[in-house]
Regions:
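Local cysteine-cluster metal-coordination motifs and their immediate loop/turn environment
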Residues: 216-245
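FNR/FR-type flavoprotein reductase catalytic core
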Residues: 74-218
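A charged, well-structured terminal subsegment
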Residues: 172, 237, 249-253
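Ferredoxin-reductase
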Residues: 2-84
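Short, Lys/Arg- and Gly-enriched loop/turn segments at beta-strand edges
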Residues: 45-55, 95-102, 241
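Nucleotide-activated chemistry modules centered on ATP-dependent adenylation/adenylyltransferase
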Residues: 201, 223-224, 245-253
Length: 253
């Protein structure tokens, strides 16, 4: 784990109410596995809020990395005001990232909302290792979708919106269709209702492969000290920050 002040490179809207921030830090960008996260202190030195915020690595490029965040409270409002050259205190990388198959295969990535973030990093790594990747993303409206240029060009980008403004109408887990049979491995990140829906769909279709999910829980500390991110699994209580955020879908849902 590295504790370092990262320098803001850019901080721009990805979609309404959600920003993509690029930061520079050789230490924080080194040896990152897709699915890992870092803690970002979203205030000036010693100011409120006290607890850091957890953000997944969305992209990593050399000594730079990007995070995707929604502006929903004091901390992220402060973060949204940072400009190029500002310093932001962070520590990471933390958690257990995704495991990619040794042999190239067909990978289906399922995401919703800001849950898209670690899946972009996963797609970049997977494409580089020769995997075929389909990214199926769900959003409320077309305006809430991550623009296609953020994905590697080799990725097939499929989107679903709840209002039907782009792609099929409904929830992303209800439109997996042919991709369920095509996929040799499934990864997902998003809210818990999406995970539950994904588990139900796969069970109903007799697909008992074991998708890896990246859970989104409030993680005040990031290393297992506060027990604020407990996840109840069939193997007992686990901590999202320390034991996750990668879990087996059917161990939790």
């Amino acid at each position: 784990m590295i504790i370092e002040a990262a320098q803001v490179i850019s901080n721009e809207a990805a979609w309404a109410g959600t920003n993509l921030m690029w930061l520079q830090s050789p230490g924080l960008a080194a040896n990152v596995s897709p699915g890992q996260f870092l803690m970002v202190h979203c205030s000036a030195e010693g100011a409120d809020p006290m607890f850091s915020r957890a953000f997944s690595y969305c992209r990593v490029d050399g000594d730079r990395f990007a995070i995707l965040y929604s502006v929903v409270g004091r901390g992220t409002a402060w973060l949204s005001e940072r400009q190029r050259g500002d310093l932001v205190r962070c520590y990471g990388p933390l958690g257990n990232g995704c495991r990619l198959p040794d042999e190239p295969g067909n990978l289906l990535l399922v995401g919703g909302g800001v849950g898209v973030a670690p899946l972009v990093a996963l797609a970049e790594r997977a494409v580089g290792l020769g995997h075929q990747v389909v990214a199926m993303m769900g959003a409320r409206t077309e305006a809430h979708l991550l623009p296609a240029h953020h994905w590697p060009k080799e990725v097939e980008y499929v989107f679903v919106t709840e209002d039907g403004s782009a792609g099929p109408k409904g929830f992303v887990t209800h439109h997996l269709g042919k991709y369920q049979e095509w996929a040799s491995k499934i990864y997902a990140c998003g809210p818990n209702p999406m995970f539950q829906s994904l588990a139900d769909v796969l069970r109903n279709n007799g697909r008992r492969q074991h998708p890896e999910i990246l859970m989104e829980e409030n993680m005040p500390c990031g290393w297992g000290m506060c027990y604020g991110c407990a996840v109840f699994t069939k193997h007992g209580v686990r901590l999202c920050c320390k034991d996750g955020p990668r879990f087996n879908l059917f161990d939790v849902f």
